[in-house]
From Swiss-Prot:
Enzyme class of the recorded protein, top EC level: translocase
Family to which the UniProt record says this protein belongs: Belongs to the ABC transporter superfamily. ABCA family.
GO CC, alphabetical: Golgi membrane; late endosome; late endosome membrane; lysosomal membrane; lysosome; plasma membrane
Residues that carry a glycan: N86, N388, N458, N919, N996
Expression induction or repression: Down-regulated by digoxin. Up-regulated by an excess cellular cholesterol level. Up-regulated when ABCA1 is down-regulated.
Entry protein name: Cholesterol transporter ABCA5
Broad class of the protein's primary localization: Golgi
Occurrences of domain ABC transporter (ranges): 478-713, 1290-1533
Membrane topology type: Multi-pass membrane protein
Protein location: Golgi apparatus membrane; Lysosome membrane; Late endosome membrane; Cell membrane
Sites where the protein binds ATP 1: G514, H515, S516, G517, T518, G519, K520, S521
Superkingdom of this protein's organism: Eukaryota
Amino acid sequence: MATAIRDVGVWRQTRTLLLKNYLIKCRTKKSSVQEILFPLFFLFWLILVSMMHPNKKYEEVSDIELSPMDKFSLSNVILGYTPVTNITSSIMQRVSTDHLPKVIVTEEYANEKELVAASLSKSSNFVGVVFKDTMSYELRFFPEMIPVSSIYMNSREGCSKTCDAAQYWSLGFTVLQASIDAAIIQLKTNVSVWSELESTKAVIMGEAAVVEIDTFPRGVILIYLVIAFSPFGYFLAIHIVAEKEKKLKEFLKIMGLHDTAFWLSWVLLYASLIFLMSLLMAVIATASSLFPQSSSIVIFLLFFLYGLSSVFFALMLTPLFKKSKHVGVVEFFVTVVFGFVGLLIVLIESFPRSLVWLFSPLCQCAFLIGIAQVMHLEDFNEGALFSNLTEGPYPLIITIIMLALDSVFYVLLAVYLDQVIPGEFGLRRSSLYFLKPSYWSKNKRNYKELSEGNINGNISLNEIVEPVSSEFIGKEAIRISGIQKSYRKKTENVEALRNLSFDIYEGQITALLGHSGTGKSTLMNILCGLCPPSDGFASIYGHRVSEIDEMFEARKMIGICPQSDINFDVLTVEENLSILASIKGIPANNIIQEVQKVLLDLDMQAIKDNQAKKLSGGQKRKLSVGIAVLGNPKILLLDEPTAGMDPCSRHIVWNLLKYRKANRVTVFSTHFMDEADILADRKAVISQGMLKCVGSSIFLKSKWGIGYRLSMYIDRYCATESLSSLVRQHIPAAALLQQNDQQLVYSLPFKDMDKFSGLFSALDIHSNLGVISYGVSMTTLEDVFLKLEVEAEIDQADYSVFTQQPREEETDSKSFDEMEQSLLILSETKASSVSTMSLWKQQVSTIAKFHFLSLKRESKSVRAVLLLLLIFFAVQIFMFFLHHSFKNAVVPIKLVPDLYFLKPGDKPHKYKTSLLLQNSTDSDINGLIEFFAHQNIMVAMFNDSDYVSAAPHSAALNVVRSEKDYVFSAVFNSTMVYCLPVMMNIISNYYLYHLNVTEAIQTWSTPFIQEITDIVFKIELYFQAALLGIIVTAMPPYFAMENAENHKIKAYTQLKLSGLLPSAYWVGQAVVDIPLFFVVLILMLGSLFAFHHGLYFYPAKFLAVVFCLIAYVPSVILFTYIASFTFKKILNTKEFWSFIYSVTALACVAITETTFFLQYAVTAVFHYTFCIAIPIYPLLGCLISFIKGSWKNMPKNENTYNPWDRLLVAVIMPYLQCILWIFLLQHYEKIHGGRSIRKDPFFRALSQKAKNKKFPEPPINEDEDEDVKAERLKVKELMGCQCCEEKPAIMVCNLHKEYDDKKDFLHSRKTTKVATKYISFCVKKGEILGLLGPNGAGKSTVINTLVGDVEPTSGKIFLGDYGSHSSEDDESIKCMGYCPQTNPLWPDLTLQEHFEIYGAVKGMSPGDMKEVISRITKALDLKEHLQKTVKKLPAGIKRKLCFALSMLGNPQVTLLDEPSTGMDPRAKQHMWRAIRTAFKNKKRAALLTTHYMEEAEAVCDRVAIMVSGQLRCIGTVQHLKSKFGKGYFLEIKLKDWIENLEIDRLQREIQYIFPNASRQESFSSILAFKIPKEDVQSLSQSFAKLEEAKRTFAIEEYSFSQATLEQVFVELTKEQEEEDNSCGTLASTLWWERTQEDRVVF
């Protein structure tokens, strides 16, 4: 009985999701640790910043009078001046003789350039004077003598008599300035004022106690606190959008999830996390130097509310994004931007306060304003307390309220946006949905149901829809009427569904069939509410799917398994089931029981504790099916539920669905026709979005099938013509479908079923015709599907965006006969016969072209190399400009009053103030005030002796009367760096003004800036050379490690099997890589030398660098080739080795340069060692040695070391390494390169005879099947035969493979697992042998051994006419065809380029290649895809390409590993027809592995089934059916009017004909019976009796079929699990399913 409609509470779902989110946080340790550590890291970092930059609190300082002006501060000064004129000479004469006698010495220079040049060789006691004219001059001191800062105002920190401003007084600057000013005044007026100027006093102005706040660390603290909480929002947004990206959220809603529970679960989890973090951070912040005066609770409130609001801000962003990789970056970026907006608001003092709160909806701004207020309160020793929450310009109470309101606003906005923003899936509400009464009123609305006649409208039911029996009338569960779905695809309108109408009934399993893109998944999405229909009507038990509220009710009855797997990656299987069971509303006390039942039903007990991300593809599908069936939902919607499963797993799912069928509705889509045939009661075939037919298997087969298949297992003496004549004698319409040495297959039409008895009787009588056994089976659904598809119009694209899969390209309307002809022509094409050297040259050029194209189109590697180049060039340019701008870093400072003093009428600005004027003369000073007015200086009279009371001011002037004139005391603020020289300039100009000269003296301070010193130049050059080494060594892995990628995708194996010579492969890559690396190195070295003209290029030493470079490039490239063989152990090979190269180069430079300061001998030892042992070092060592020996000014006789000594080893070693790498490359190629088909003219070692493998006789197995034993004897006989007429193309003799098992390492026991057990078989030319088996049976080991990827433990393999380990150069096989399971295709190359590469490798000429490509594209319908890159192709086209590449060059042996994987039924049939046709010419053989039994039946001449590493059986399909099949299947369709009594009589009749027949699950109109093989003694008698019963009873039609190969396979593979446990066979039961993860299953 189906479970009642679920109605689960919000709080229960919230608790469940909270547990799920908690488990996810615990399992995703990387992100969780970052969320916890990042805020704490930021907090401790800010505490450190606050400790390093505390607020500077200065006590009150009184005035400090400096010592009198001391002319001896300029003692021993050399005073150079320019230009030399009479006036300047006169001025300097007075300075040196009158003012500063015996103190300074003057020197004359013709111009300033000479003066600057002289300063380069002078000591710091040299001072320059540059006269601009008679009234203006520059004073040029060395930087160490005076402050050179371009900042006019300094801090009070540590300032006393030695502060920057006072140095102008103490170090002689003002003395020299006063002396020159006095000389100029005397020159102008003939009056000496030197005594007055010399009497000038200097006083450091006293300052009040003050707290000095450093803006920069405060800004850092503010912005970092804003960013500190961003990891929470970052990872939350990523988690939510990732679930949306994987469609988990929408499917959870289908299962009954409430939106409220979804949002609430994340809110509660992060609220708890932020609560704890905020509490911890608040305690740390208040206990440290960050907020020591504040209340922990207040700080906690700020942190907690901001943390919440930032998380809710991230929630608000999630509905706006579809990709998780974008949302996190945007969230962090927006946080930073809004944080800086808030920082500007705080730092801009003039920002209008009325506008501040307009930014409060941005939580970052509100929080930053609040923290700024806390810091403001901390500055005044108050701290943020509850008592002052309402104080200050920005009260904290407002911040707290705004953050709380922001949180509520963000959550509501997140929920609203989630409802209205159109998404990829799910129904969306209107923008004002919350204003509609229907949203608040949940009253159910009833709609008038439509009858089937109305639903199906103008469809002729008799033609395509089979009427249901009377027992299903009134049980219509899902009604579909005129459903249409269209969408916009770029500029065109695509119709996914076109007027689709039919009913789905309760108690039945309904299958949706159709090729990829027909709209099956679209219909599923509409039925579960993921997307609305464009038009039409669909209801589920009366609930319309297009109405959101009604869909919510319908979803309570639905279990869904979409194409994409539903699971939470980091949760275990059991956790996934338990959590989703709770979300579905299963009672809490029943969850464990329900979950265990699902695990048991689907055979998942062994993996219940495995995380979902570690499951194979098939296991994930099982989990998705298990989730769908949880709680016994009334309706099951399953979209390709068994995709990626092996046959055994598929049968488990089938049994589960059949068991749960009663009183429920099950709808599934599939591409496996046998699955639909066995499992579904009704099949709906959809093509081009339209319904083609609906009905039971017997209805579809009888109406569209080709009839019965008569399969005969024949001996070698069979008279085929006579046998065909006999068949056609009884059934003229019979047609021969398939013929080989051991099997014949005929088709027998339905209309002649009454003649079957006579035919079978004749076959029994004429035993001399060579028929060993025969069987009959009804037409398959595959045939029905194909017949319907051929009739369909396929002239336009028709696929659904909602399936999210690439469109499976359709074949065109040409017949299969035309394709056969094309393939027959193709099968005759051969590779051109060319000489080995000509082929080698052709392969080299081909590999070079392919490698160049790959590099050109592989954007990741190109971007990496360009980025590294740009980084190096950017550093070069930056250092160049830094070096040249350093000389001009300090601009000349004009010492004028405007620097610090306001002009009359100006308002106070920054450090500009009025000049305080103190009158100490006891008389008026009107003349002086007049002078200040003339000079445009604002003055303020000051009569108090305490300058602190008038603070802040830049300076004051105390005027004292002397004998001749005023004498001044210059009182200056110690923070004003240039205030004292400016005051001296003012005083000098006053004296000049007082002497009636209106001109003013102008003075500049322009310190000497020397050229960069030699040591700095060396350090800079060493740094850039080391940087070159680090960057350039990081490049080769990005373009020279393509071998790793080729091995990973198995393209190299494919190339080798195609006849590629290993030496041609490596030379072809080197032809591109070596010149490319040369160009890069020359560019980088050229830029290094171009930007450093301080090097002298000694020809010999420069040639040494050149010779080193010539060998270094190929050496590094060859070493990179060798390193690429680590691809098996390293995931991201390029990135890993790039990092290793760079770190190694850095370590080498660091070690050699560090030891240079110790002792030369130690450095030399390291240098030699690195040159010998580390191939990436020699150029770096050579370059550094060259730099050390190439200074312009380097002494000629250097005793410390001989650069040639170090250059020599760096030059020679790359040449020796090249030779070593070539031999190593050859060695690694031999070990890891796989089998070489052709003899290599250069890598001779590869063609040497391999070591002989053990060849023991296999142990005697009494239980071995007789056919397997016969095959073994046949192989043994063929091995010893020297003159056999024709040897098999493939021969495997006693192949045995064991693997070491590392599981018992701790127990010190070395055990082995057996993959294959002495397998022997052969494949004749013209034969296709199918190799079947469950997971872990050993099929992959056999294939990998054949292609040379795996070495067998023992046994021999013969391909063509010689053994795989033979040293003979037999010309009979030049290449092997191989179509691996994973596509060995280069994603950035086109189809045509693939053909050209493989054709050239196989020796085809360009002309032949063009013709072959044309034939292939015609045969396989690839023409329209020729110019598309592989990454843009659908999976089916990729498989066609792999098959086509394997057939190029007419290989004698072809290995096909799952060739039709990922194709829809039509494409599979196309591929199967191509395979059959390609092997008609009897010149080639194929070994095919598959998990699709229908593929084996359709393609293979013989089939071998492997179980537990052994061959269980081998023979034709008919032979295996006859030998291992358990019986027949009888299905009878009754006429509608038959009564129950008549049915009982019919059943008794069947029991009479077949005494042991068992009735299967069936309906009143269809009876199904399973007939044991023992009951069918004669097919002729069986059909005769069934025909008689058909005439006697009301039987409309019947089918009588032999057991399928699928059933034989399942029976044979049941024994593997027991044998695995007992015999120690390789338990790789997940191998096949793991490989399916890379497959695209439609």
